[in-house]
């Protein structure tokens, strides 16, 4: 896989990610134990499950950065998907205070690994899906995870409820790329957005591409798995 390191793009993404990390921490200040046990917008997951995943996904990206700095290519999660699922289940029942503390720890651990990366930017990693990814692309993947899963919490009282809670900066950055990815899935590498999607606002349009917005009579975009 060719390296896709572009310093200017990476700088913008890392800055946006840091801002989204801080927004998440600020919004979670009012999290309660009762909220942790509520169902999230993801079927079968509580708010606690989503928070555990945000934490562990951050830890997995940190591991990749540290390994890449040593010239190593590792799996995103030790033990693969089964260990990832078990770890989320094991952490989901933590208290609100414990969740917030661990989210904060994972954020600063990851940001430290990103800040100290040198040659690691030119490495690759095996993602949990089995795909090989460039380390330089991981901050955007993490940014997407933070924004999308913050909306998946479904906590309107905290401002964490669906695509409309995603930051404008994130939507502006990721929408063009995800739109291009959708178009590339069509015959001859061209597949235009359906008319029902083109009439949506930017956040809702990106939400459809990422499987977070449903449109009656229209199948999912199919980009996320």
Task: Kindly give the residue locations of the regions a language model identified.
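Basic, Lys/Arg-rich alpha-helical nucleic-acid-recognition elements, primarily the DNA-binding modules
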Residues: 1-42
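Structured surface interface patches that mediate subunit assembly and partner/cofactor docking
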Residues: 1-13, 66-76, 116-225
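Hydrophobic packing residues in well-ordered alpha-helices of helical domains and bundles
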Residues: 14-17, 96-103, 139
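Aromatic- and histidine-enriched alpha-helix N-cap/loop-to-helix transition segments
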Residues: 19, 42-45, 49-56, 141-144
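Structural signal for well-ordered, non-membrane alpha-helices
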Residues: 21-25, 29, 58-62, 104-115, ...
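Helix-loop segments that flank and shape redox-cofactor active sites
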Residues: 25-46, 116-131
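Conserved alpha-helical segments that form or flank metal/cofactor-binding pockets of metalloenzymes
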Residues: 51-80
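A short, structured beta-strand-centered segment in the mid-to-C-terminal lobe
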Residues: 83-106
